[in-house]
Amino acid sequence: MQTSPLLESLMEALRCLPGVGPKSAQRMAFHLLQRNRSGGMRLAQALTRAMSEIGHCKYCRTFTEQEQCTICANPRRQQNGQICVVESPADIHAIEQTGQFAGRYFVLMGHLSPLDGIGPMDIGLDRLEDRLATEEISEVILATNPTVEGEATANYIAEICVQYGVTASRIAHGVPVGGELEMVDGTTLSHSLAGRQKITY
């Protein structure tokens, strides 16, 4: 079946989004054209502006339109002395929603993966090392993902922290709140047991 070249182009473009296959892209394209053209125009304008104007914070590497993101520019955050290392800007958003962290961040934009040719320089560890050398940092909280690559990356950064006399800590991983032990996989349960905490009264 032949369709409009522009429609085909739209569907192909939508497929660059994660989890969007041919059918989903087709549904989205037809919905925008058939029922929500104004929404499609807003999406196009927002996407164009975001792609052209959003860059990276020169300190933590998260997404921002400014040279420095709002978190790094906050004087209270600067005085905290803690840096939380994450793999992506999305992780910052998740941690900020908890309201439990008052320090600053450093975004790796990935993790170490020798098999894929991704080394320390590719994830900005030279810039993190510069911060450890020049800023008054008391603790680096390693919040990389609980994967083989994430653990390897955390261990590598912890070794760098030792060289600068900075405390390195790892976020806890374990049984989710409301979860049942019999449904939890062995690896997660092992992390839970290893990261157990003493109950004090």
From Swiss-Prot:
GO annotation, biological process: DNA recombination; DNA repair
C4-type ZnF: 57-72
GO function terms (MF aspect): DNA binding; zinc ion binding
InterPro entries attached to this UniProt entry: DNA_Rcmb_RecR, Rcmb_RecR, Rcmb_RecR_Znf, TOPRIM_dom, TOPRIM_RecR
Keyword tags: DNA damage, DNA recombination, DNA repair, Metal-binding, Zinc, Zinc-finger
Gene3D superfamilies reported in the protein's UniProt record: 3.30.60.80, 3.40.1360.10, 6.10.250.240, RecR Domain 1
Domain Toprim: 81-176
Family named by the database record: Belongs to the RecR family.
HAMAP family the record matches: RecR
PANTHER family per the UniProt record, alphabetical: RECOMBINATION PROTEIN RECR
Protein task: May play a role in DNA repair. It seems to be involved in an RecBC-independent recombinational process of DNA repair. It may act with RecF and RecO.
Name of the protein described by the UniProt record: Recombination protein RecR
Native species: Photorhabdus laumondii subsp. laumondii (strain DSM 15139 / CIP 105565 / TT01)
Gene giving rise to this polypeptide: recR
